Amino acid sequence: DHYDHLDHSTIKRIKDNVNIFVVPHGVGNHLRKWEVKEENIIELNWNESFEKDNIEFTCLPARHFSGRGPLNRNSTLWCSWAIKSPFVKIYFSGDSGYGKHFKKIGDEHGPFNISLLDCGQYNKAWKYSHMLPSEAVLAAKDLGTEFFMPIHWGGFTLAMHPWDEPVEESIKFADKVGLSYLT
């Protein structure tokens, strides 16, 4: 539920035009405060799924934390997502440090056609919350992805690295291991 992933003004603007908000457990409390109708909120815990119109959303583990301030740290669930249709499998990492969970997710839910992986806003001291570009590429390999898309870079300045370093480094590492990517 960090501000760079859950924006109050955006939700207020779109809430009447979105039929369903599929969110991790606890995030529904924010949505209800922002006047999203209860029947439009689906909250999931890790390894729970919701299917609508032949599209399945599965809430999966990530290595991160939640909170919109110091008083509500870890009061909602952080997660990643597998999104599957009869035609494509997509993985979205959300914010996550690198870990064994990527291999497990790949084994249980993959392989994926496209994996959108956190590669920005990193610092070696934050390795349990955000991946380095090289780790994002390792995660893509663990997931068994066909195409890797580096995400979570270039939107907000939260780390000291140069603006476009995350995507440039990710592409460099992807090329080294023969991984196809989308930018």
What is each model feature region?
Residues 2-5, 64, 92, 130, ...:
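Histidine-centered active-site/metal-ligand motif
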Residues 4-5, 66, 124, 157:
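Short glycine-rich, flexible loops that bind phosphorylated cofactors or substrates
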Residues 16, 36-39, 55, 76, ...:
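Structured loop/turn residues at beta-strand edges in well-structured enzyme cores
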Residues 20-22, 26-29, 89, 97-183:
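Cap/insert and terminal regions of metallo-dependent hydrolase folds
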Residues 1-17, 25:
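Di-metal (Zn2+ and/or Mg2+/Mn2+) metal-binding site signature of metallo-dependent hydrolases
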Residues 31-45:
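Helix-loop-beta element that forms the nucleotide-linked donor phosphate-binding surface
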Residues 44-110:
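Core dinuclear metal-dependent hydrolase active-site scaffold
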